[in-house]
Amino acid sequence: MDKRTENMLKEPIFPLLVNMSAPNTIAFLVQAVVVLTEVWLIGRLGTSALAAVALAFPVIMLTQQMAFGALGGAVSSSLARSLGAGDKQRAEELLWHALFLAACGALFFLSVFYISGELLLQILGGKGELLEQAIAYCRVFLLGAIVIWLSGTLSAALRGIGNMRFPALLIIFGSGLQVTLAGGLILGWFGLPRLGIIGAPLAAILSGIFMSSAMLIKLSYFSQEVELTLKRLSLKK
């Protein structure tokens, strides 16, 4: 029995819950600060840019909630059940299934937006320059959204195997990177090109690349509970 399992079976319940939930709580608070900071940065561009982000907000939130919530919750619980049953091989196969679903989700959202995204934003009230800015924002975000889906899936996988701290620390460091890049790419700080409103989704994508890469390396080379190896690559039922 490994130390983590022993702690879960023997430690008092309340301190155990606090210890396991604290990293995620702090990480999500940091993410909330990131959202507020990006809104402030975009607000420096003017009210039209801020309105364009508000118009694009439902598309962005739906993508993130599907990646981190719907798919992430399923991945976390399925891996936990497989490991709880002592079936490591199934857990590793499930991880590959999860990555495949993440890629499909990113492609589906991108395809739907390119087919009917402009109409959707018009229904939500977008027109003229406001609509053009919102479309540009969504296109940049969805073109790179595969890393958002991967981040949500991989962080859920790590939580499913009982590793709460690593994804939380990554979210905190990734959030710091995102804010720094957002300031540079939106407003031209730190000598970076001033891209305006599309700097925000680009910063999120670059931060997502950092986080998803770190989690892929962790699961491929430094994880004992579940290893992401090509020998488990299978899409069987």
Where are these predicted regions, by residue range?
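Helix-terminus/linker motif at the lipid-water interface of multi-pass membrane proteins
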Residues: 29, 33-51, 121-128, 184-195
